[in-house]
UniProtKB/Swiss-Prot annotation:
The lineage of its organism: Eukaryota, Metazoa, Chordata, Craniata, Vertebrata. Keywords: RNA-binding. GO terms for molecular function: RNA binding. PANTHER family: INTERFERON-INDUCED PROTEIN 35/NMI N-MYC/STAT INTERACTING PROTEIN (PTHR15225), RNA-BINDING PROTEIN 43 (PTHR15225:SF8). InterPro entries: Nucleotide-bd_a/b_plait_sf, RBD_domain_sf, RRM_dom. This is RNA-binding protein 43.
Length: 343
């Protein structure tokens, strides 16, 4: 992605598409001839990002050709899987790195076998060696990370169902234990198969991209009201690009299931934002103080005109996050207002 951004042409992002799901080891010429032969004469450049297997950035000579490709969304490859095609800046991130803690699967699954299975299911991901603690680093395209998430959720659900089945069998056995029945008060009617009430909703942990979380918190009117509605406390810990949320019942179990429900809602919103948001970065470092001052003044004037854009001002740069059209217009107006050349 960095290589594509270094092209000094203001239209390069509009002419660039991201292609995911490619067979690993495919050369640039093979990619164009096999999957984009009808548009081959319109291809200006093909970039394989070094950190993302199965992903390529294709820069077309004309914007309309790129738009035609994007409208198709998927390309049929005959007997092979479908390619996923998207706009270069359609997502907040095209490349993702995640650190997974697989130790939660340890009692039910051999972690080494789990990693081997995941590598087979999603070959476009890069896995680091599995640590003794059960942690492992994973790198790849955002779409591949989504597939990984679904695979892990399926594994977790399967393990949870097995645990519940075992717990249910154990409760039934305990409820029918003659020794327990005899220990009951003579005046009380013995009941067989009595199950222990499930504990109040335990805390839930959720890890999000910091930019997406900040947009969710500051630009979405339903985040705080949802926490209040379901009486859920949220502790936020920001650590660079990653934000960890700890959700907890605020009323000691008065609303069973509320914590899990809120977690699922936040996950759903975050996934939608991953696919819809666009991020623009304006570099301040290296500019003269007068240029920085002009940009900050223009920045303040444009805030009210683009309420759907989240603006984070840092010492070295400015982050703009929001819908693609809004962030693009905001950046253009900001640069023009500050007397800067739009690139």
């Amino acid at each position: 992605m960095a290589s594509a951004l270094t092209v000094k042409d203001p239209t390069v992002s509009e002419r660039t598409v991201v292609v995911s799901g490619l067979p690993v080891g495919l050369s640039k010429d093979q990619l164009v001839k096999r999957y984009f032969r009808d548009e081959g004469g319109h291809v200006e450049k093909v970039i394989y990002p070094p950190r993302s297997k199965g992903v390529a950035y294709i820069i077309f000579k004309e914007k309309k050709v790129a738009q035609t490709i994007i409208r198709q969304k998927k390309h049929s490859l005959g007997s092979e899987p479908l390619l996923t095609v998207s706009h270069f800046s359609e997502k907040v991130f095209n490349y993702v790195m995640a650190i997974l803690d697989l130790s939660v699967f340890r009692p039910q699954i051999v972690l080494e076998s789990l990693v081997v299975d995941l590598k087979k299911k999603i070959p476009t991901l890069n896995f680091s060696p599995l640590g003794r603690s059960g942690k492992i680093s994973v790198q790849g395209s955002f779409l591949a990370i989504l597939k990984l998430k679904q695979a892990l959720i399926s594994k977790a659900i399967s393990a949870l169902e097995n645990n519940r089945k075992y717990a249910g069998e154990r409760r039934n056995w305990t409820g029918q234990n003659p020794r327990r029945v005899l220990q009951k008060n003579e005046n009380s009617a013995p009941t067989l198969g009595t199950s222990v009430p499930e504990p109040a909703g335990s805390p839930e942990t959720l890890v999000l991209d910091t930019d997406v979380f900040l947009y969710l918190k500051h630009k979405c009117q339903f985040y705080e009201p949802t926490l209040s509605k379901y009486h859920v406390l949220c502790q936020e810990r920001v650590d660079g690009d990653i934000t960890t949320l700890c959700l907890q019942d605020a009323r000691d179990g008065s609303y069973p299931g509320s914590v899990r429900h809120v977690k699922e809602l936040i996950e759903e919103w975050a996934q939608e934002f991953y696919l819809e948001l666009r991020k623009e970065l304006l570099v301040l470092e290296g500019r003269r103080e007068s240029e920085k001052r002009n940009m900050r003044q223009a920045f303040e004037q444009l805030c009210c005109r683009y309420p759907r854009v989240l603006m984070n001002v840092h010492r070295t740069h400015i982050d703009l996050i929001g819908p693609p059209s809004d962030t693009s217009l905001f950046k253009t107006q900001l640069m023009k207002s500050a007397g800067q050349k739009v690139t």
